[in-house]
Each structure stands twice: as C-alpha cells, then as structure tokens.
C-alpha cells in the first residue's frame, strides 16, 4: 500500500515488494488501484526486478546469453521503427534519454492501430543501448532517421508527411551531430555531454559508427545521405558512416546503391545490406561475396539477415552461408543476425528470431548456436580447401525447362 499525498504536482513513489507465490510466466501483471475517495492520476508505471545485468536494468538471464556469444557490435534500435510510419512517428533518439519517467512515448510502426496501438515508452533508450554495449564489450552502431519515413509502407514517399524537403533537413543532420557529442564528447559545456554526465556516465562511449537510414533507397535517399555525410565527415572525420542498399538481396535498389557507392566511396565506409530468405537460398549463396569489389573504401555491412525459420536446416544453411562471409572478410567487415530477441505472444515477426523468451524463461534457437560458434571461433586466416568425393559422379547436365509467353498481345512461335 502506498499513501499518496501529492495535491498539485507530480510525485514519484517507489516500493519494493515480493510476490506471495510463484507467478505464471505470462499470465500475471501489475494492477494499480485507488482505495481512497479522491481521484488518482497515474502518469508512468515501471515494474523492474531488483537484480539486473550489472545493475543497469536489463534481464540478467538474457544478457548472459549474449555475453556467452562474445558479440562484437550491436546495431540499434533496429529497423523500421527508426523510419516511422510517417515522419511524426519516426524514432528520435533525443526523446529516449534522460529521466525515464519524462521520456515522450511514441507509437510503434509494427502496430500503429488507432484503437489498440503498440506504444514505445523508450524505457530502453539510446543511453541504455550505449550502456549495454559497454557492459558486453560491443561496439555501438546506432541507426538514425535520414529524413525519410518507411518507403515500403509509404511507396514513393513524396509528400512532407513522409519526406523531409532538402531545405528542412538540417535539424535531422544536427540530431546526428548531437548524438556524436552525446556519445563521444568531452567538452562539459556542451548540452549533450552534460546530459550524458547527468545520467551517470562522465567518460565518453567512444562510438565509431553511425548508420544514416535503415532501408531507404533511390535518388531521394542518396541526395539526403550526401548532406549528412559531408557535414559529419567535416566535423568528425573519424566516424565511420553506414549507408543502405534498401530492402532486398538484389534488384534495382541494390544495384543503384552500389553504383552510387562506386562513385562516392569517400562518403560511405559501409553499405548496409538486408535480406531474409529461405534456407535453400542461403545454402546456395555461400559464394555471394566472392566477386564483390575489393578495391573500394565502401565495405559490406550485412546489417540484417536470417533464413526464414528456426529449424536445424535453417541454422545449417546459415552456417554454410557464413563460411562465405568469413572467406570474404576483406569485403564483408560486419554481419549481424536479426532479430535478436522475440517475446512469445508479443511479436508480429515469426519468420526467425535468435532468442525467444517470456516473462521468466528463454529458448536458444539452433540459429543462436550457429552465431555463437562463429563468434567464439574466429581465425586470422582463411585456408583454401578442396573436397574430393570418391565414387560420386558430378552431374553437370542442365535441369529445368524453357517457357515462352506474352502479355496482352497476339504472338506466333515457330521452330522452338
């Protein structure tokens, strides 16, 4: 029981309690009731365990599974949430720092329903992500909005609801510059350095990478990216910038991105590729990067990838594919499986996830073990190998069929 005596202003109340009995993993919740005669306004409620990973608020059991992988970097806060359904609902990192109770909530792109929306409290914000990276020995790789909402959902994104005009882009570039100060700055007169210190971290986080955009593509994207890159490189030349090739493993947007990078390699250190494909696709594309350009500054960052499933065959196909990533380490400098976590009963994404969890337990998928094996067993050299199979004949015959057709016209085919 908490006795509230605040009349005209907000007041924070904290209490520690222990449940009388073991709670159901997903069938329990916290209910706040008012037993008094007056009205009670509740602005923000947070329920947290006392024992968290290194005392920084994250579940110890889940973080320990990441720790066992010895991960090298974390790309956050993820994908389409950064973009937003519209620019008004895009992720703004400045809303995610400071006192948790004062952070501005935002609707999440994955369920923007007007009647039952999924809201983000930003309880896990950019400061917590930086702290998580430090606790796990990972490089932070934050992704920022580039002035374009999700193009998959908005199509051409030509109106101001989805596309920031070039003459109004500067505040978004300033957000990127301010983030670098928040993460790396040492001048204690700087507003964003002060905010980091006030949150309890005087020393800089030493961030080395920033991604501009998530899965943006086309000329409207690169026109905006170039403005970000020029200003960031001018002020912070040591920051590695990540550009993006869109939403697919191949096609026009991917081709356009690499053509742009070949002409502007000084503006992009990494090209972020994303693809989710079948297990067979991954097995068949283990040689994907064998023929990528090696004489360019812009290297591959495979920022999101997974085969569509958590079965053993999916994991084995990913492992086969990852041998190609290792073999081409001079081309593919970074790779990150996605998504990393999914809560049972609370996700619209079921194609694949690395770790499933509920309120009390977790399940490590075969995909997790493949990622862990590769992460914990990295070598310095890739040795050429040759496999000879005795008694097995190689069938080089072409298989398949040929079809001809037309659309909306009359045709005659002869001598086929």
Residue locations for each model-derived region?
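Short, solvent-exposed loop/turn elements at domain surfaces
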Residues: 82-85, 281, 412
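N-terminal catalytic cores of secreted or lumenal carbohydrate-active enzymes
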Residues: 1-235, 239, 243-266
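Extracellular/lumenal ectodomain signal focusing on beta-strand-rich modules
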Residues: 44, 209, 270, 304, ...
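Surface beta-strand/loop "capping" patches
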Residues: 380-394
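Catalytic-core region of carbohydrate-active enzymes that cleave or remodel glycosidic bonds
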Residues: 131-132, 230-241, 259-377
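Structural detector of coil-to-beta-strand junctions
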Residues: 29, 354, 401-403
């Amino acid at each position: 029981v908490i006795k509230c005596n605040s009349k005209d202003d907000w007041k924070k109340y904290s209490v520690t309690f222990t449940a009388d009995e073991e709670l159901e993993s997903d069938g329990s919740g916290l209910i706040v009731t008012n037993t008094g005669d007056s009205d009670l306004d509740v602005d923000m409620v947070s329920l947290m365990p006392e024992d968290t990973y290194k005392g920084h608020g994250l579940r110890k059991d889940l973080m320990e599974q990441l720790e066992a992988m010895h991960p090298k970097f974390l790309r956050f806060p993820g994908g389409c949430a950064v973009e937003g359904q519209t620019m008004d609902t895009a992720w703004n990192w400045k809303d995610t720092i400071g006192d948790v109770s004062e952070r501005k909530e935002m609707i999440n792109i994955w369920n923007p329903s007007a009647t039952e929306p999924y809201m983000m409290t930003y309880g896990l914000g950019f400061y917590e992500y930086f702290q998580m990276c430090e606790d796990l020995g990972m490089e932070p790789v934050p992704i920022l909005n580039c002035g374009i909402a999700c193009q998959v959902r908005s199509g051409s994104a030509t109106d101001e609801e989805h596309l920031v005009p070039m003459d109004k882009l500067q505040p978004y570039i300033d957000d990127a510059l301010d983030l670098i100060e928040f993460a790396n700055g040492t001048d204690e007169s700087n507003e964003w350095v002060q905010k980091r210190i006030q949150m309890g971290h005087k020393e800089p986080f030493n961030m080395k990478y920033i991604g501009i955009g998530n899965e943006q593509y086309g000329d409207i994207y690169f026109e905006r990216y170039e403005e970000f890159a020029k200003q960031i490189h001018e002020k912070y030349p040591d920051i590695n910038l990540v550009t993006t090739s869109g939403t697919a493993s191949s096609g026009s947007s991917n081709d356009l991105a690499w053509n742009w990078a070949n002409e502007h390699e000084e503006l992009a250190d990494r090209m972020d590729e994303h693809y989710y494909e079948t297990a067979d696709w991954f097995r068949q594309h283990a040689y994907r990067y064998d023929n990528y350009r090696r004489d360019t500054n812009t290297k591959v960052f495979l920022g999101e990838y997974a085969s569509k499933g958590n079965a053993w065959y999916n994991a084995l196909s990913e492992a086969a594919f990852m041998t190609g990533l290792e073999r081409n380490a001079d081309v593919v400098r970074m790779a990150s499986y996605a998504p990393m976590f999914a809560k049972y009963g609370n996700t619209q994404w079921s194609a694949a996830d690395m770790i499933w969890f509920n309120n009390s337990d977790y399940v490590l998928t075969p995909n997790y073990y493949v990622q862990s094996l590769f992460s914990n067993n990295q070598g310095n050299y890739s040795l050429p190998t040759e496999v000879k199979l005795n008694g097995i004949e190689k069938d080089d015959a072409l298989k398949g069929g040929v079809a001809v057709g037309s659309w909306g016209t009359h045709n005659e085919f002869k001598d086929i």
